[in-house]
Amino acid sequence: LKESAGIGFLTIAPGIFLQNFANARDPELPADSSKRWGMLINTNLCDEGCNACVDACNDEHGIEDFGRPHSDVQWIRKLNLVDELTGAKKSIPMMCQHCEHPPCVDVCPTGASFIRADGIVLVNSHTCIGCRYCMMACPYKARSFVHENLSNQLPDVPRGKGCVESCTMCVHRVDKGEKETACSEACKKDGAKAIIFGDLNNPESEISRELNKYGGKAIRADLGLNTAVRYQGI
């Protein structure tokens, strides 16, 4: 382990480095178990031609486009759906659903995939061995494998080649007490105001009030995973 100017570089394999930043959240501090962070997405508002959430997520986390759509990292992808009976079209953002009972955690052989006390599902890049069992287990195809060398590392979002990763619900923002994820912020500013982020356990939060008033559906609710991302209009 080499350290310089408050930044540590940990070699996990030849040519693969992960960065530890001195201003990172102390991993020994527990997440708040009284909260469960989640998202509500109104597909009636989501526009097929709008990619504000995707672009904001990529910028926030240093995700680059290498021109390989089948293997490039995607934390959010837009799905364009057509109802077979009515022909109605929907465009929905798909990301990690932050399940209460995440299959990715169950199959991980090293414990790299884990769920925090506040419901956010994460990957520890230091212990991920890139086996991709979690990718196969995820029914939402929400995880990506990092194939490329990374040149756009950001202080709050350390990433590693040869690791699997997915939406973190902007955990670096959550741990700083911020109220919006990059995608929800961008959707409100540049999009259709279709994404609400908040505490599902707080009955007074905007997301809870909206769910209580209009409801919301989990994708593949039949799996019993109790996802923290819910959708309206599907």
Predicted regions and their residues:
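Non-ligating segments of multi-cofactor redox enzymes
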Residues: 1-234
